[in-house]
Amino acid sequence: MDLSELDPHVVQLFPSHALAIAKNKILEMGAITVEACENVREYFISKSSTAKEAVEELENAINLLDKKISEYLLLISHEQLNDHDSKEYFADMKSIKDLERVGDLCINLTQFFEAVYDEKDDFSSEAKDDIIAMINMDIEMLNHAMVAFDKHDLDDIIYVDDHESNLDYYNKKAKQRHIQRVTNKTEKSVIVNSTYVDILSNLERIGDHCQNIAESYMLEEENFKPDYEVDSAFNQ
């Protein structure tokens, strides 16, 4: 992670180039955030302390990038920016905050899992399946969100929007299945019962941030409508 690339001298001379440098760092931040999500999944599945420590280290890197890129973008904002660069600036500022929040949610998830594992307890196989499915959806969405952020590609934006709707629906159904297990007394762990809904909510919130990132640039367009005429395609 080379932060020396965020050279303040470039800002005054070539603000558009400085924005490109910042964007590359945000893409790097996105890749680190994906890696954090992957290690959350690994920790959940294997209970590996190495994976848990990796999440913590990656989250520290995400926080550092958030701070340094934000400072760099603030310098850029003081320069005269054309319309395109202004949109890039606002999209960049929003996206780094969404990535930082995903990093926080990754830490939340590892803490929930750790609370269960420290009690020598575990999740039911059905609960595990739902959590893994949602983590997998989050990782796929984040990958596509970063492509949408980079390329402003409508197909990737639609992909993320579509899957965010699917994630919301899956979250609702997973909660219903959990309530059924508690009612039937097939989910016996007290700590799992007390944390499971929070885990699902954190996973759903990651999806929300992915959608924000995917739409970050397009939302700066005056005529952009987040639902863009694709609702009919979703309902087919």
Annotate each PLM feature.
Residues 1-236:
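Cytosolic, long alpha-helical scaffolding segments
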